[in-house]
Amino acid sequence: MQASAAFTHRTGIDTICLRPVAVFDAEGYERMLKSSPRPAGVGTAWHMGVHIDVRDVAEATLRAVETTFRGHVRLLLCANDIADRRPTLELVAEHLPHTDWRGGREFTDEPFRSLIDCSRAQEVLGFRPRYGWPGR
């Protein structure tokens, strides 16, 4: 990504780096939902249940190609919810017990809310993920 930023700086050619996490398609969802017992999640400490549907990645990619944005930007992409049966606060308490919680009421109102803020992708591309974890 530093190379992309340097490239844009040197040449003036625009670059958008999309950073999706744990991309799932229909078969991937099915495999995860059938695994028994389900791994401490897909929601283990290394990504805390953050995921995105391949269809949303395709949509963000199309928007990145068609945007009028100028310059260089890195954009995180993830679903609005997490890939786990346990609420987000439980995952945080389990995997990060010594970390002071700074989340707000939004995690009470949306107990499976993702810990990743992807609002920049909405600002730059008008992108909002449409797909969440199946069954939710």
Task: Identify the residue ranges that each predicted region occupies.
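Mid/C-terminal beta-alpha module of Rossmann-like enzyme folds, strongest
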Residues: A58-C118, E123-V124
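Glycine-rich beta-alpha junction loops
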Residues: V21-F24, D81
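Gly/Pro- and small hydrophobic-enriched strand-loop and loop-to-helix capping segments
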Residues: R130-R136
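Active-site Tyr-X1-5-Lys
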Residues: M1-T15
